[in-house]
């Protein structure tokens, strides 16, 4: 059924439709006066390359949410196939205080935790915020990048983790 009536789309039908989309999996992390916190997110998107800007959507009911707002900085760590367990941990399987106990964490310019071995990490300052429904859309200026690992990407689709194999790019 195709409908243009926004009231005709229930929250559960919308969530089911969104579950069909394949998305990269990220750990979004922060540290500063509001404390260290992190969560798993798939709602990350490039906004512009001039200046480099990303957006990330965070649920205002998340236990980590206040730390992100108070700190004003975050790092978007894009996960590889080797990080599926971490994705589950940061999605709520373990308490906030235990989420950073595992692998090596570093820091770039903002001080937000950067996951060693991430596919790529975008170190950002939050420059704007928009409330939409249950979430905030955070507009984030990219201040630094961690080295790109070249590993296989971790995706989430159909309510399961999937792996996107690396392919060799062919030159012209």
Swiss-Prot record:
Sorted alphabetically, the Gene Ontology BP terms of this entry are: nitrogen utilization; uracil catabolic process
| Primary enzyme class | oxidoreductase
Q: Which Gene Ontology MF annotations are present? A: FMN binding; FMN reductase (NADH) activity; FMN reductase [NAD(P)H] activity; riboflavin reductase (NADPH) activity
Spell out the reaction equation it catalyses. Answer: FMNH2 + NAD(+) = FMN + NADH + 2 H(+)
- Which terms are listed as keywords in the entry? Flavoprotein, FMN, NAD, Oxidoreductase
EC number(s) on file: 1.5.1.42
Could you tell me which HAMAP family the record lists for this protein?
RutF (MF_00833)
Similarity comment: family membership: Belongs to the non-flavoprotein flavin reductase family. RutF subfamily.
Q: What's this chain's function?
A: Catalyzes the reduction of FMN to FMNH2 which is used to reduce pyrimidine by RutA via the Rut pathway.
> What's the protein name?
FMN reductase (NADH) RutF 2
């Amino acid at each position: 059924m195709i409908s243009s009536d926004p009231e005709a789309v229930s929250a559960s039908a919308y969530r089911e439709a969104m579950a069909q989309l394949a998305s990269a999996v990220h750990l979004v992390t922060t540290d500063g006066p509001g404390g260290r916190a992190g969560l798993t997110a798939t709602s990350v998107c490039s906004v512009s390359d001039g200046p480099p800007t990303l957006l990330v959507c965070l649920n205002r009911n998340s236990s980590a949410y206040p730390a992100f707002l108070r700190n004003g900085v975050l790092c978007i760590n894009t996960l590889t196939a080797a990080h599926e367990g971490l994705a589950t941990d940061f999605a709520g399987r373990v308490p906030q205080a235990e989420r950073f106990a595992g692998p090596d964490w570093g820091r770039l310019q903002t001080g937000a935790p950067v996951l060693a071995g991430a596919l790529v990490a975008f170190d950002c300052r939050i420059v704007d915020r928009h409330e939409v429904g249950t979430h905030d859309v955070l507009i984030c200026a990219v201040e630094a990048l961690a080295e790109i690992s070249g590993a296989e990407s971790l995706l989430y689709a159909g309510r399961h983790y999937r792996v996107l194999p690396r392919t060799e790019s062919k030159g012209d």
